[in-house]
Curated annotation (Swiss-Prot):
Organism the protein comes from: Zygnema circumcarinatum (Green alga)
Disulphide-bridged cysteine pairs: none
Gene: rps16
Protein name, UniProt field: Small ribosomal subunit protein bS16c
Subcellular location: Plastid, Chloroplast
GO CC term (a single one): chloroplast
Amino acid sequence: MVKLRLKRYGRKQQPTYRIIAIDVKSRRQGRALKEVGFYDPRKDQTHLDVATIITFIQQGAQPTDTVSHILNRAGVFEQIHAMSIHE
């Protein structure tokens, strides 16, 4: 099973995160299947590859709670819902 989760980067007391698709059995800092975004909580900046995220979610990937909150604020779930209505 694949999860969308945060991978920590940055210095002490200055974290930044990459949003990655990774196998459930892998460690947080393990090798990612694909990097799909970036999140900086200090500046509240988010950069997402929305098309890739939607593809992973449609194939069964489960976002963690924090990533789910980030995706919800970016409107990704609304796009998925709109795509499913038009099909």
